[in-house]
Amino acid sequence: MAKRLNIVEEKFLDTIKNNNLINSGDKIVVGVSGGPDSLTLLTLLNKYKSKFNYEIIVAHVNHLIRKDSTDDEQFVENYCKKNGIKFYCKRVNVQEIAKQQKKGEEEVGRNERYKFFDEICEKENANKIAIAHNMNDNAETMILNLIRGTGLNGLEGIQPSQYNNRFIRPLINCNRNEIEDFCKENNLEPRIDSTNKENIYKRNIIRNKLIPFLKELNPNIIETLSRTSVIIAENNEFIQKEAQKNFNKITELKSNLVEIDLKDFNKMPIAMRKAIIQLSIDKLNGNIRNISKKNIDDIIKLAENNIGNKYIIYKNIKAEVKKGKLKIQINERQIENSN
C-alpha cells in the first residue's frame, strides 16, 4: 500500500492541478529565503520536476539587515549545490535604499526581491516565478489591506496565481503549522528569521497580536479568511470581466488618454462606473496603487455633473469633462496642484 502523502504535499499538488499553475516545459524561478515556507516549496518543486517536466532555478536576495543573513544565503546555496539546482543571489542594502527612497524596509525589500526575480527570468528565459506565500500570509494581507482601506482587489488577498500565471503560489492553501510539520517530518532544518517575532512591522503586529486574539473568537480564522478571499475573488472576477466589456463599448483608448462617453457611462450602476474608472487608470498608469476611494468618487462626481471645462488633478492623473466625454489622462511629469 502506497504511503499517504503529507497534507502539505497533497495541497501543493491539488493547488497546482486546480489552478493549472505548472505545465510541461515550464522554466520556473523560485524565490527562496531559506525559511520554512520557501524551503518547503523548493523541496516539493524539486521532487516533482521530473514527473511534470519543468525546470527550476533558485533566486535568493540577501537584504543585509540581520547579522545572520549571510548564513541564510550560504544555507540556500548549499542546498542548491547538493541538489544540482542553479542558484542566483543578490545582496541588497535594503535599509540604505529605504532611507534614500523614504519608504519602509518591508516595501523596499519586497520591491527588490521581485525586481531580482524578473531579472533572473529574463536572463534564463524563464516564464514563471514561484513564491512561497501560504494561507496565513493571505489572512494577514487581507487584514492589513482592510486596515489601510481597500476595495475588492485588496480583500481578494493573495491568489494562487497572478498576471496570467506569471507568479504562482503552490502553497497558498497550506497553513503555517502544516508547513512547519512538513519540515519536521522531512528532516528539513530551515532558517528562522528572528525579526518575525519582533513587532516592528504592521504585518508582524497582525501576525503576533491580532490574529491570536481573533483565534479566541474563531479558532479557524485563517481558514475562514481564506474561504472569504476565494468568494471575493470570484465576485471580483465577474465585475472585472463586465467592466472590460463595457470599457470596450464606451471608451476610446489612446497612448496616454482614455475618453469615456458620458451618456452611456452615467446610466451604469455605480459599482460598474467605479470599476471602469479604475480599469482606465490601470491601463494608462500600469497600476492603481495610491488611488484612493475619494479620488475615484471625485471623478465619478465630475462625470455626473457633466459640466464642461471642469477638471481634477491627482499627482500625474488628470480627469476632465469636455464635450460629453470624460477624459482621463496621464501626464509624464507629476503635477501636485489640483483644481
Kindly give the residue locations of the regions a language model identified.
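AMP-forming adenylation/ATP pyrophosphatase catalytic core
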Residues: N6-D37, Y54-I57, V61, V92, ...
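Cytosolic histidine kinase catalytic core of two-component systems
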Residues: N177-E178, N220, K294
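Internal, active-site/partner-interface "lid" segment
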Residues: K197-R203, I222-A233
